[in-house]
């Protein structure tokens, strides 16, 4: 039986880590795509990861390419293409150059992957999701941004470290845009079932909320470029959304998607999880 195809647009840090995670979990065969000037990078990473499979025991096929024909027919497409942030830059500073890139990707997806479920990672994320949906004409439920999973994970981690508890004991969710407008929902956050506001002082909670909003920028300052381990894991989590049925048990996961003129966070079951951005 043929495996499902998952195409990754962009073979940089996030794209490479995505390919590794997907292959190890054998979620499908992977096509790692990049522009012709970076085809060697895509092919080299693909070959390295296939050899890694022989060591670790996974059997996913990984193909590096710069040919859109190899992307065709993918069930899932994850887009990481674009220029990453540098120290001192906001996500919005990337708008001009990455908008041109996302438009080119969108035109090719219309031709080669008209039925794909598309997950956007490129920044500024909410604008990229909107532009890709607009250019492709795909249904809003078929084009999502992974930001909510990543932002919620950062919020969850910072709370766990503050309270010295296991990350899995914290329930936290971040809604809104992937940037300064994100809203860590403290009123619905719990630690072992106890509302976080009963456990964390208001000033400390406020500092954690602010650190969550600046979580990506903190890493950019330290590394000189954007994060990629956690964003890749968040995007892999998002691949489950296209596989879950409306009745299957599922964890609610926030994402960025567009319906008409409104940006909505949606759950992994496809139901609206919260209202528009603040």
Model-derived features: positions:
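Rossmann-fold dinucleotide-binding core
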Residues: 81, 117-197
